[in-house]
Structure formats: C-alpha cells, structure tokens
Amino acid sequence: MFLGTHSPRLDEKGRIILPAKFREELADGLVLTRGQERCIYVFSQKEFERIHESMREAPLSSKQARDYIRVFLSGASDEVPDKQGRVTIPPALRAYAGLGRELAVIGAGTRAEIWDADAWNEYLNEKEAAFSETDDDNLPGFI
C-alpha cells in the first residue's frame, strides 16, 4: 500500500528517485499514466493489469468510457526502476503534470501520485477545508 508524502527532486534527465517505502512494490515494474487533477498516477504492474481488466468490461457503446480509456491508456508508460530506484518520467507526462524540479510524491492507497510540489500544496490547501467537513454521507462506512 502506498502511504505518505515524499519530496524528491526531478533531475536533469527527467528522473526521480522513488521513495524507499515504495521501491519493493514497484521493483518489478510500474506504469506511469495521466492522473486526474494534472498529476501522474503510478501503479505497480500488477495493479495496472487489474485496472486494465476492469476497463475491458466497459461497454464500447459508452462514449464516456471510450474517451476515458483513450486518455488514460494513451498516456501510459511502463518503466522499470534502475538499481538506485530511479525512474524516468517521459517528457509528455512531465509536461502534462507541469512538473518542475521540486516534486511531491504521495501515497494514495493502491497507487502513488507525482505532483509538482507547488501544485500539490495549492491542491492540499484548497481541499483541506472540505476534508474536515466530509461526513458519512459522502464516504459511507469510511468515517
């Protein structure tokens, strides 16, 4: 499970060092793809395969499903971390997420997310007020 917030830097070759806590789960390979809110989703290969299988169940007659699957999969890149735990983020994904040098890598349960540090801080500041007001109606059985 991916948890916490980490602050790696993007190097001049477009690589990041994965947080140590994430490396074991991602050692055999990972998939980077466009995330919602202009971040990059990071999935283990196994989790991405599970998601892909569920996407295959979506009806082809659903325009919304087709659109989502196209955007999600066309931005995907499978990567294998090097021995130092570094992963190259493809230029198109770096541009999509507006990544600068300072990053925030957050754990989101079954995935990690890579954010530009300023964008993450802005998002978090914006959402924290609503977070404190979330009730059982919005997330049944969760709180």
Curated annotation (Swiss-Prot):
CDD domains: MraZ_C, MraZ_N. One of its GO terms (molecular function) is DNA-binding transcription factor activity. GO terms for biological process: negative regulation of DNA-templated transcription initiation. It is found in: Cytoplasm, Nucleoid. Residues 5-47, 76-119 form the SpoVT-AbrB domain. It comes from the Bacteria. NCBIfam families: division/cell wall cluster transcriptional repressor MraZ. HAMAP family: MraZ (MF_01008). This is Transcriptional regulator MraZ. It comes from Paenarthrobacter aurescens (strain TC1). The lineage of its organism: Bacteria, Bacillati, Actinomycetota, Actinomycetes, Micrococcales. The gene is mraZ.
